[in-house]
Amino acid sequence: DAQESRGLGDVYKRQGWRMHKEKPHATTGKPAVPNVYVKSATLWGGNLAVLASLVGTPYFPQVKGGVLFVEDVHEHPYRVERMLTQLLHAGVLAQQKAVVLGQFTNFKLAPHDKGYKLQSVVDWLRSQIKAPVLTNLPFGHVETKVLLPVGATVSLSVEERDALIYCCLLYTSPSPRDS
């Protein structure tokens, strides 16, 4: 066959990336939308502070209908909310089919934080956009990470607390004429 999967083991070819609720992988927590299926979306994103700083510049990726993933480190929940608000008001979040939040780690609560937690940010975000918001995907500044094929076309399936991201990386073998 001229087209075949590249870089994925047999299990991943058949099942996609399965992230189970028993492991601290991409779960919806308390799902805003219990069952969702997103088809043919560009997977893109990265560090939230970097993306927020690029809004309004020619360097900000112009992805519509994508699956946006973001994470950060050493950022308090109110700062995460501020950066997501910037993406919201720039129209970025409304153009996505899904938003996947990574693990926001290594911030220290201060006395003035008054208990404002990341879950409050997640609840607020879910109230602001129509796209499903998934949480706790292990990527970025965490010890155990999943591989995310940035720029690949993916499908996303959410059933209750389980989320699956499917990706098919295809290549064409060079023809003898190309050699």
Regions found by a protein language model. Give the residues of each.
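Active-site rim beta-loop-alpha module in soluble metabolic enzymes
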Residues: 42, 48-50, 54, 64-67
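Conserved anion/nucleotide-ligand pocket segment
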Residues: 6, 10-49
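Solvent-exposed alpha-helices and their adjacent loops that cap or buttress functional pockets
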Residues: 35-36, 43, 60-62, 92-93, ...
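Single conserved hydrophobic/aromatic residue that forms the stacking wall/gate
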Residues: 1-12, 171-179
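ATP/nucleoside-binding phosphotransfer catalytic cores, i.e., glycine-rich phosphate-binding loops
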Residues: 103-170
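Internal helical hairpin/lid segments
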Residues: 59-113
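Predominant activation on well-ordered alpha-helical scaffold segments within soluble catalytic domains
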Residues: 48-52, 81-85, 119, 123
